[in-house]
């Protein structure tokens, strides 16, 4: 029996995770779902944002479904020592799972083009997957320092680090439209020269059926807004991926529509990208679409059930058209939207 660990977390996390878990139970009744604490909620209960009992539960998990972590800006959690803050629990979780590749789909669903800040003709049909390296680069290198009026950080990658995340991108492209755009700054950065060399060599050895091109990060930052439909899979390192994925996140028009997956050698981590929204927590009005679409990614990448994942995505798209949530200009609350997704699963256009 497959095991999925749910970590509802803080703010609206428990509400959207409950909605997502309800959908998961409906479409995969054989899955054992086990709930554990993380973030501020875990600190309040156990004095640790990533308690040992949560860590232990991951050992035999097939996938992890995360809600949201953190509180308001004036939350007393922000006055805690940094290792005890909710966000430290999230970082510890990612380290424990060894997640080295983040997958961020950017899709404009049919009938929802009006939500995008782009013109409808630019937004229509956008379907991008950004694959970002998560554990290396300038964010994690230990060679860093502030000394008087001088500071430095080091961007460093090795061939094995580049190849393992590139394999994820090429594999994803094989399931999609067969095109990968590798993003770097090889005209000025030696680390990008290595990145470009290793990505190209891997493609030439193992993925000759995938079309690969290389583009500079500044060019992609412009073109992903001016002509987003030109991209299929975007592969990039940690810093560039952090910026590009947040830039692309505005294209669908709401963070409430954005799921994500983080993959590594262990169970994958699946989560909506939106924050904990403490201002609306407990009111039952949070949009659970991103959490439910994270379940679709979990089914596809964590449990290898792509057909069921496709059904969930189609059901969410139908529910969004017929029962939009309040953040999208509609009236549906969390419960109403979740039921709409479950009802849509029985629609001929979904099944």
From Swiss-Prot:
<dbReference type="InterPro" id="IPR004429">
    <property type="entry name" value="Isopropylmalate_DH"/>
</dbReference>
<feature type="binding site">
    <location>
        <begin position="275"/>
        <end position="287"/>
    </location>
    <ligand>
        <name>NAD(+)</name>
    </ligand>
</feature>
<keyword id="KW-0560">Oxidoreductase</keyword>
<feature type="binding site">
    <location>
        <position position="218"/>
    </location>
    <ligand>
        <name>Mg(2+)</name>
    </ligand>
</feature>
<dbReference type="Pfam" id="PF00180">
    <property type="entry name" value="Iso_dh"/>
</dbReference>
<protein>
    <recommendedName>
        <fullName>3-isopropylmalate dehydrogenase</fullName>
        <ecNumber>1.1.1.85</ecNumber>
    </recommendedName>
</protein>
<comment type="function">
    <text>Catalyzes the oxidation of 3-carboxy-2-hydroxy-4-methylpentanoate (3-isopropylmalate) to 3-carboxy-4-methyl-2-oxopentanoate. The product decarboxylates to 4-methyl-2 oxopentanoate.</text>
</comment>
<feature type="binding site">
    <location>
        <begin position="71"/>
        <end position="87"/>
    </location>
    <ligand>
        <name>NAD(+)</name>
    </ligand>
</feature>
<comment type="subunit">
    <text>Homodimer.</text>
</comment>
<feature type="binding site">
    <location>
        <position position="242"/>
    </location>
    <ligand>
        <name>Mg(2+)</name>
    </ligand>
</feature>
<feature type="site" description="Important for catalysis">
    <location>
        <position position="185"/>
    </location>
</feature>
<feature type="binding site">
    <location>
        <position position="132"/>
    </location>
    <ligand>
        <name>substrate</name>
    </ligand>
</feature>
<dbReference type="GO" id="GO:0003862">
    <property type="term" value="F:3-isopropylmalate dehydrogenase activity"/>
</dbReference>
<feature type="site" description="Important for catalysis">
    <location>
        <position position="139"/>
    </location>
</feature>
<dbReference type="GO" id="GO:0005829">
    <property type="term" value="C:cytosol"/>
</dbReference>
<dbReference type="GO" id="GO:0009098">
    <property type="term" value="P:L-leucine biosynthetic process"/>
</dbReference>
<dbReference type="GO" id="GO:0000287">
    <property type="term" value="F:magnesium ion binding"/>
</dbReference>
<feature type="binding site">
    <location>
        <position position="218"/>
    </location>
    <ligand>
        <name>substrate</name>
    </ligand>
</feature>
<dbReference type="InterPro" id="IPR024084">
    <property type="entry name" value="IsoPropMal-DH-like_dom"/>
</dbReference>
<keyword id="KW-0100">Branched-chain amino acid biosynthesis</keyword>
<keyword id="KW-0520">NAD</keyword>
<dbReference type="InterPro" id="IPR019818">
    <property type="entry name" value="IsoCit/isopropylmalate_DH_CS"/>
</dbReference>
<keyword id="KW-0479">Metal-binding</keyword>
<comment type="similarity">
    <text>Belongs to the isocitrate and isopropylmalate dehydrogenases family. LeuB type 1 subfamily.</text>
</comment>
<keyword id="KW-0464">Manganese</keyword>
<keyword id="KW-0028">Amino-acid biosynthesis</keyword>
<feature type="binding site">
    <location>
        <position position="246"/>
    </location>
    <ligand>
        <name>Mg(2+)</name>
    </ligand>
</feature>
<feature type="binding site">
    <location>
        <position position="94"/>
    </location>
    <ligand>
        <name>substrate</name>
    </ligand>
</feature>
<keyword id="KW-0460">Magnesium</keyword>
<comment type="pathway">
    <text>Amino-acid biosynthesis; L-leucine biosynthesis; L-leucine from 3-methyl-2-oxobutanoate: step 3/4.</text>
</comment>
<keyword id="KW-0963">Cytoplasm</keyword>
<feature type="binding site">
    <location>
        <position position="104"/>
    </location>
    <ligand>
        <name>substrate</name>
    </ligand>
</feature>
<dbReference type="GO" id="GO:0051287">
    <property type="term" value="F:NAD binding"/>
</dbReference>
<keyword id="KW-0432">Leucine biosynthesis</keyword>
């Amino acid at each position: 029996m497959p095991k999925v660990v749910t970590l509802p977390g803080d703010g609206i996390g428990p509400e959207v995770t409950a909605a997502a878990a309800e959908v998961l139970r409906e479409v995969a009744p054989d899955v054992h779902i086990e709930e554990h604490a993380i973030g501020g909620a875990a600190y309040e209960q156990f004095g640790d944002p990533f308690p040992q009992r949560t860590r232990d539960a991951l050992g035999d998990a097939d996938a992890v479904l995360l809600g949201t972590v953190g509180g308001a800006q004036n939350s007393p959690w922000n006055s805690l020592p940094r290792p005890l803050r909710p966000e430290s629990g999230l970082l510890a979780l990612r380290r424990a799972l060894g997640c080295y590749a983040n997958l961020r789909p950017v899709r404009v669903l049919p009938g929802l083009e009006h939500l995008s800040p782009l013109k409808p003709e630019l937004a229509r049909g956008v379907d991008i997957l950004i694959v970002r390296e998560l554990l290396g680069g300038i964010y994690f290198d230990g060679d860093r320092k502030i000394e008087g009026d001088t500071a430095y950080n080091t961007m460093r990658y090795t061939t094995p680090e580049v190849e393992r995340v590139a394999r994820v991108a090429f594999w994803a492209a094989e399931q999609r439209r067969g095109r990968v755009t590798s993003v770097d700054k090889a005209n000025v950065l030696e680390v990008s020269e290595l990145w470009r060399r290793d990505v190209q060599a891997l493609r030439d050895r193992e993925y000759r059926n995938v079309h690969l091109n290389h583009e500079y990060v500044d060019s992609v930052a412009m073109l992903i807004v001016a002509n987003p439909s030109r991209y299929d899979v975007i592969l990039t390192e940690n810093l560039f991926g952090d910026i590009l994925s947040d830039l692309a996140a505005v294209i669908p028009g709401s963070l409430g529509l954005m799921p994500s997956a983080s993959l590594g050698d262990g169970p994958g981590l699946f989560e909506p990208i939106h924050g904990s929204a403490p201002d609306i927590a407990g009111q039952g009005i949070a949009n659970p679409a991103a959490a439910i679409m994270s379940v679709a990614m979990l089914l596809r990448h964590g449990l290898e059930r792509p057909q069921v994942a496709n059904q969930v995505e189609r059901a969410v798209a139908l529910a969004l058209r017929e029962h939009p949530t309040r953040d999208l200009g509609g009236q549906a609350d969390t419960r109403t939207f979740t039921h709409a997704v479950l009802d849509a699963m029985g629609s001929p256009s979904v099944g």
